[in-house]
Swiss-Prot record:
Disulphide-bonded residues: C6-C20, C10-C22, C15-C27
Protein's name according to its UniProt entry: Cyclotide psyleio B
UniProtKB keywords: Disulfide bond, Knottin, Plant defense
InterPro entries: Cyclotide (IPR005535), Cyclotide_moebius_CS (IPR012324), Cyclotide_sf (IPR036146)
Post-translational modification: This is a cyclic peptide.
Pfam families on file: Cyclotide
Recorded family membership: Belongs to the cyclotide family. Moebius subfamily.
Function: Probably participates in a plant defense mechanism.
Record carries keyword Lipid metabolism: no
UniProt-listed PROSITE patterns: CYCLOTIDE, CYCLOTIDE_MOEBIUS
GO biological process, one term: defense response
The keyword S-adenosyl-L-methionine appears for this protein: no
Length: 29
């Protein structure tokens, strides 16, 4: 399966996408 794409903006330090971490201001792996 394809891994979810990280890249949403994160404000509270958490990301909605599984496996992604907040590297302000965006989520990434």
């Amino acid at each position: 399966g394809d891994l979810p794409i990280c890249g949403e903006t994160c404000f509270g330090g958490t990301c909605n996408t599984p496996g992604c971490v907040c590297a302000w201001p965006v989520c990434n792996r």
